[in-house]
A protein has these predicted regions:
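Non-transmembrane, aqueous-exposed alpha-helical and coiled segments at domain scale
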Residues: 1-633
Length: 633
């Protein structure tokens, strides 16, 4: 449509009630629009050659509306228009620039920018700084907008600082790069498909006359692939907004690292200074959605650069994913040729980075580097291993197809990512490096499939109570019960990694080991301590590392205690009988630790110092303080 040169956004839904619009020639007003008839008329104008808003059927415009040339001296403002645009009482006429400002500032649901020009800035910016003199008389400040959402079909319609100001004022906006990403993604697919088809024609695997019809036949498939990428990226930003305040400390460190190591210019990218971040930390607010979008872009670019500097994109486990980038029509016929694509490394790297960041979060790889010293490729390998072992793709698919609210969906995804984080650290800390993803998946996925169904029946006491309370919080708000329980049980099945190792080392049936592990966990109250550790404030990096060290210490002790109790038990004994025998045999050593733990439990004090003492008491129960047994190295 005229003025919407990029996307024709007003033709993408039959339910739009278009109150006002303007381009370089006209101003359109329809204060009480009929969605159905106005859509049909917009469609007619779109199909009419050389049309403008002046061609709009005036009989379809509600009372008080109309179409005016931008060159008129003033436009009469009917009462219906005054109400629709939220103008002050007594306003009866406005100049064209004033009316366009009123349209931009109207209290409506959506402000759609599809044209050329910058129409919104921050109150801290001058028109001269914006650099779009032709729209100086029209431009408004982000803090003055009353719209709920801004959609940017065009580029540069809002300044970077204007977006941040609007977002900080409660508005919903990402960036033009995010809202326009489908176009770029579509172009990338088109170019890569054409490279493939041209190589097929040259090698005589595809007749020349079939090339163009085959390309055209893939239009819908390409659209689906592109939309899937866009949905995933917007889902990432949705979750990132939810966790923005609690992750601000990590974001600050990540920005500092990108600035020092990657040359990020915070001022140029409109990203907050350390001083501004300190202010937000005190206020309890995080990065805005536009800032998160910008950070995401830099994280993805830097991670992709890291991957392309290594052999990871050539690794068979990862390279085998490249056919999924292409539409089914060529994927099924030319899989071998796809795997030999000239840009296969770049395509594989892009696919991996998008998946890991979109699913794992903006800080996933960065936190693993902080916590374990993992390289970018290490984090990709860890992600892939955890995804496959715990069938996380299936979990995420169930969450996203459950039909729950965005709020509930985000909560469930965040909970699932706790398993992703924890299990990723486990693989990085406990398995040979670099992680041989295929071998690790073969080893642990079988153990998971065999044992995970048993876990619901093995939880008891605080383990079960905590699970039910957390799951009920989303069940009460509409989440399916089975899904909620499965998602909130993920941290309980995380232990199956240790359980699989114990079974292998001790040469015992994994189901027997699992029964003892969970029983001992509940008996000693380690699950209670782990929950308390999770409740500690994240604070700065050192507080976060202290929390991780505590958690790892508790899990390590539980692993060694399970092996010790298992070794002292007799075949055919129940888990409780094994525990009773172990406690009887080691009564003097255990009594001191148990007494200290009881005192801690009863004190109700759950700070870092107290929990550190508790972890030390649990560790003192272990007979041997030697090194951890190693498996499969």
């Amino acid at each position: 449509m005229s003025g919407d040169v990029f996307g024709n956004g007003m033709l993408l839904s039959r339910h739009i009630r278009l109150v006002g619009a303007f381009d370089h020639r006209h101003i359109f007003l329809d204060p009480n629009p009929d969605a159905a008839s106005s859509f049909v008329e917009r469609q007619r104008l779109f199909e009419l050659p050389r049309s403008s808003w002046a061609d709009y059927d005036k009989s379809l415009i509600s009372e008080g509306g109309g179409v005016w040339d931008r060159t008129v001296k003033s436009v009469p403002i009917a009462e219906s228009v005054r109400i629709a645009l939220g103008l002050a009482e007594g306003v009866t006429k406005l100049s064209p620039p004033e009316l366009m400002q009123a349209i931009l500032s109207a209290p409506v649901d959506l402000l759609w920018n599809g044209g050329i020009g910058t129409y919104v800035k921050a109150s801290t910016e001058t028109n001269a700084q914006v650099g779009d003199k032709s729209n100086d008389a029209v431009r408004v400040d982000g803090q003055d907008l009353r719209v709920k959402v801004i959609g940017e079909g065009g580029n540069l319609g809002v300044t970077a600082l204007g977006r941040i100001e609007f977002s900080a004022s409660g508005g919903h906006i990402n960036t033009d790069a995010i809202d326009n990403s489908a176009g770029v993604d579509c172009s990338d697919h088109e170019v890569n498909i054409k490279i493939l088809l041209d190589s097929l024609v040259r090698s005589q695997l595809l007749p020349t006359q079939e090339r163009n019809p085959l390309l055209a036949s893939m239009t819908d498939d390409v659209a689906a692939l592109v939309l899937a990428d866009n949905i995933a990226q917007n889902a990432l930003l949705g979750i990132s907004r939810v966790t923005a305040s609690q992750m601000l400390g990590v974001h600050r460190r990540q920005l500092t690292d990108l600035t020092k190591a990657r040359g990020l210019d915070r001022k140029l990218e409109a990203l907050p200074t350390d001083k501004e971040i300190e202010r937000r930390l005190e206020a309890g607010v995080g990065l805005t959605s536009p800032e998160l979008a910008t950070l995401t872009a830099h994280v993805k670019l830097s991670l992709k650069d890291d991957l392309l500097a290594t052999e990871l994109p050539d690794n068979d486990f990862f390279a085998q994913q490249i056919p999924q980038y292409f539409p089914t029509a060529v994927r099924d016929r030319f899989e071998t040729e796809i795997k030999a694509h000239p840009l296969r490394r770049q395509i594989v790297a892009t696919m991996l980075v998008n998946e890991v960041i979109d699913n794992g979060g903006i800080t996933y790889a960065y936190r693993l580097a902080e916590e374990t010293g993992a390289s970018s490729t290490d984090s990709i390998r860890a992600y892939a291993a955890v995804r496959e072992v715990f069938a996380l793709d299936e979990v995420w698919s169930r969450i996203r197809s459950a039909g729950v609210s965005a709020e509930i969906e985000n909560e469930l995804i965040v909970e699932s990512c706790r398993l992703l984080d924890r299990a990723s650290r486990w693989f990085l800390a406990n398995r040979p490096q670099p992680i041989a993803v295929g071998a690790e998946v073969a080893r642990y996925s079988a153990a998971y499939r065999a044992t995970a169904p048993l876990v619901p029946g093995l939880l008891a006491g605080h383990q079960l109570d905590d699970l039910l309370v957390r799951a009920q919080s989303v069940i009460d708000r509409g989440a399916p019960e089975a899904l909620a329980l499965d998602v909130f049980r993920l941290l309980d099945v995380y232990c199956l990694l240790d359980i699989a190792d114990i079974a292998d080392i001790a040469d015992h049936d994994i189901a027997e080991v699992a029964e003892l592990y969970y029983a001992l966990d509940a008996h000693l109250g380690i699950d209670w301590l782990l929950s308390a550790v999770s409740g500690l404030e994240r604070g700065d990096r050192w507080h976060s590392l202290a929390r991780l060290a505590l958690r790892d210490d508790l899990y390590s002790s539980l692993r060694q205690l399970t092996m010790e109790v298992l070794a002292g038990g007799e075949p055919g004994e129940s888990p409780q009988e094994k525990i009773d025998e172990w406690e009887s045999t080691n009564a003097s050593r255990l009594s001191r630790a148990r007494a200290a733990l009881v005192e801690i439990f009863e004190s109700g004090t759950l700070d870092l110092a107290t929990l550190s003492v508790a972890a030390r008491q649990v560790r003192s129960m272990v007979r041997s303080m030697g090194t951890r047994s190693e498996v499969g190295r």
